[in-house]
Amino acid sequence: MDNVRTALITGASSGIGASLAVAVAASGVTLHLSGRNSTRLEAVAQTCRGRGGIVTTTTLDVRDADAMAAWIGSAGHLDLVIANAGISGRSRDGGAECWNLARAIFETNLGGVLNTVLPAMAVMAEQLPGAGGVRGRIAVISSIAAFMAAPDSAAYCASKAAVDRWIVASAHEARQRGIVLTSVCPGFIRTAMTADYRFPMPGLMDADRAAHVILRGVTAGRGRVVFPWWMGLAARLAGLLPSRVMAAVASRHR
């Protein structure tokens, strides 16, 4: 990304976040990376430094609003912010999700995004506009799951739907302030999160390739990046199915 000199990425210690950090890293680019695993985060930072990047790392939980606001506020000028941190979870044996699991998913996937995007927008709104009047770009990692309602992943689907709709709905007003918002809805990505899945994952993609697709869409200023496109279409069609049909399909892959 030629116009990015400073970037901030959450959930950068593994998976898509790590691949995005490495993809953005280049000579003269400053990266502010956060994650919960300090050892893995430092390993990613070292890789980015090897590509010429200037890297700072912070170990924190995106659910901590005060810590997030302080971290983002201390970063200085921000060209690109990627709210990537997220978790998943599935109910066991077709039962309802426990309260603790559902709450953790919403607090991380939705609350964590709010704790990232809102402070970042405040910082960017004070920056001088660049090419095309853009003050900064913010991408949020949602999921193709946002378009459907998987019975055994209710909180995950709902949390990803919430952030997708929020970003898409906020994009016009944000653009008037010089801030470009992008909702990213990937399909299955080969990460630690999907390693334990025991069901078919059509279109499974490497995290490095996914990072390339994401950054290409963000650079183009797209409001929503959905890939693979055919998975996005399939998810939207699945979202039209009666709940009993979705439940029957899910039960076959437990």
Where do the model's predicted regions map?
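Conserved mid-core segment of classical short-chain dehydrogenase/reductases
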Residues: S88-R103, E126-A131, D152
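Active-site-adjacent segment of SDR/Rossmann-fold oxidoreductases
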Residues: M148, A169-V180
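Residue(s) in the substrate-gating loop at a strand-loop-helix junction
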Residues: S143
